[in-house]
UniProtKB/Swiss-Prot annotation:
Bilayer disposition of the protein: Multi-pass membrane protein
UniProt cross-references to Pfam families, sorted A to Z: MRS2-like
Low complexity bias locations: 52-74
The entry's keywords: Ion transport, Magnesium, Membrane, Mitochondrion, Mitochondrion inner membrane, Transit peptide, Transmembrane, Transmembrane helix, Transport
Superkingdom in the source lineage: Eukaryota
GO molecular function: magnesium ion transmembrane transporter activity
Motif (YGMN): 452-455
Any one GO BP annotation for this protein: mitochondrial magnesium ion transmembrane transport
Gene field: mrs2
Cellular component, GO annotation: mitochondrial inner membrane
Source organism: Neurospora crassa (strain ATCC 24698 / 74-OR23-1A / CBS 708.71 / DSM 1257 / FGSC 987)
InterPro entries: MRS2-like (IPR039204)
Span of the transit peptide along the chain: 1-75
Protein name, as recorded: Mitochondrial inner membrane magnesium transporter mrs2
TM regions (residue ranges): 428-448, 467-487
Amino acid sequence: MPPALRPAAPSRSLLRYLRAQSEGLSFAPTCRAAAERHPALQCRHGCTAGGSTRPPRQPSSSTTTRSLSTATPPKRTQLRAGLVDLEAILPKSLRKQRTTKSLLALPPPAGSLRFSSNQSSDCDSKRPKLREWLFGNGEKKGPPDTRLNDDDIRVALEEESGSIFQRRALTAKAAMDPRLRCTEVDENGNVVMVDGELKKSELIAKYGLLPRDLRKIDSSNLPHILIRPSAILLNLLHLKVLIKHDCVLLFDVYGSKSSYPQSAFMYDLQGKLQQKQSSGANSLPYEFRALEAVLMSVTSELEADFEAVRDPVIRILSELEDDIDREKLRVLLVLSKRVSTFEQKAKLVRDAIEELLEADDDLASMYLTEKTHDLYRGEDDHTEIELLLESYNKICDEVVEEASNLVSSIRNTEEIIRAILDANRNSLMLLDLKFSVGTLGLAMGTFLASWYGMNLENFIEETNWGFAMVTSVSTVASLIVCWYGLVKLRKVQRVKMGDLHNRNAPNHWFRDESTDVLLDPSNRERLRRINSMKSAQQKRSTSKKWF
């Protein structure tokens, strides 16, 4: 949020000029009453603000002819500006302070038109002039002045005017401070806080994190495993977990799309943390048990997602072997995208674990319980955590390999379908060429017959065998042209990799010895596809023998 704008304060020279004008046009009774209430306003030689050098009158011993009534207090006069009201400029919090302290502590101004005429020369000599008020006096004598200077007034104005905007800005900033919903599990496996909201600043201060660490939890979908001096931060698939030596913090448990897997993880985590660990050498510390629960949940989720993707893919691939349909191809396209996304997700999880395994200093820093007892391990002393991470890394690697095999099966099926479609396209083109050759033969016969039908005199019309001869010659010419075209077309069609039947002959230099390999159960699908391709090729060869 941008900082609140502060209004510009009046300049120093403007304030001095306004003060001089206000004091020059003030009334004498106000200054005199102020001098009577505050003796500090009296001159050093005993003169009051009114300028009288006489000592104060003593009350007469005789009885006074008039008695003063004290029922109502005297009305308090205040200093007012003649041209500009300074109280309208000042904020409310400084008005009383100025009227009671600042204005009464000011020395009597020079140039006052309402002062009494019986002022002493000492007070006139001590009274500052208009030039001194405007430009200041270089010499400072006597005790320090207690009146407010221009800097104090300017600072007070800025603070008063900006305090409201500052309070509003701080309130808006506090309201916009992002919060994270989390569930906390203590060292005994008991849930101490369910769906609680914590500010990011509180998490940073309480658990010793950095702001960039919370950003990876809040806005990043890439798997991360961060090792900090006093915490382990994990962002793996549906889990965003903070592990300490005595507590586990799970973020966004309820209300999210993956609430069910996170709830199942909470039950598994409580079961692992509530197990009584022996004090032997093989016992795992608190943070390792929590980390194992996280990795187990992540790998289980990966396997469940893979099972949900693999079954429809295998089904649609088997259906495409029998019939290539447009709707089936569309379903295969959707499943192919889904499998590719899953493969990428599994690779990211595997890479995150492998990256942690390659960092020896991070592995040694994961012993949080020992750090609380001031025990620090060397960079090569991390056998327990390394074995734990390697076991789950192998599981992730297996899932990635199976996903890669499934993707390769989809790619092979797509290539086979593309080859079949190309073969069908070639068959259609071949049929078109055959019709073109037949049309050419008929055109040749028609061309010969057109000579006989011309309206010209020739000896053929006078004979009895003319019609039969022209018909037979046209037919023979058409057949010859068709036979020649089909022979040339068959030679063009023979441009292929060769006959598969002759390769298995005893004298052939190449022999396929991969039959035993194809009998393996993992390659049965591949063998079935090869047999179907051979049967389809045999059918096509038998249908073309009449040419």
